[in-house]
Amino acid sequence: MPLEEDVKQDVRKWSELYLEVPNKHLGGMPACPFAKKTWKDNKVLVGVKGKHKWYKTQLNLYLKNIDWNKHELLIFCDPYFNYGIEDLQNAIDEYNKEYNKKDVFFMGFHPDNPANEEEQEFLVTPNGDAPTVDSDVEYSMMLAQKFSLLQEASDTLHKSGYYKLWPRGYYQDVVVSRKKTYRRIFGGQHDG
């Protein structure tokens, strides 16, 4: 099987095993309550960087061509990564600086910085035990989605009490900082 297909299947399995299952640390709610439906409705586009291709050139091509009415999430994977965690974070920050005002939000995952039980147990052991994942593929991921859609979903989850079980520091780093950025760009007050 070609590497591109391996990566796409691995991303799908990651979502199924970690993001979509009822999570004991979150009162039975999945880590990402909207993931299962988004996949089911074919609203996820997984792109894989080609070998000997420039990262930003490839990602920019996906961003230029994505139809946000058809897809709600772009997961851009790089199985040829040769950059560190800080480099990926710098790229995420650059893309957010440029694209947040265009209603697109970026986040990422680097294989050298996986979620850990101490800080993000709910992302590591959704059912109490770490799922067994048979994969020899390593890749970085850059996720892009409509900022307004993400913030609307986050506000809905906040009102339901979903975030009460999140680790406080992780909640501040992810949810509160994102909401402050959204309110700064698009107006309104930070209320959560």
Language model: regions and residue ranges:
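Expand to "…catalyze enediolate/carbanion chemistry for C-C bond making/breaking, isomerization
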Residues: 1-192
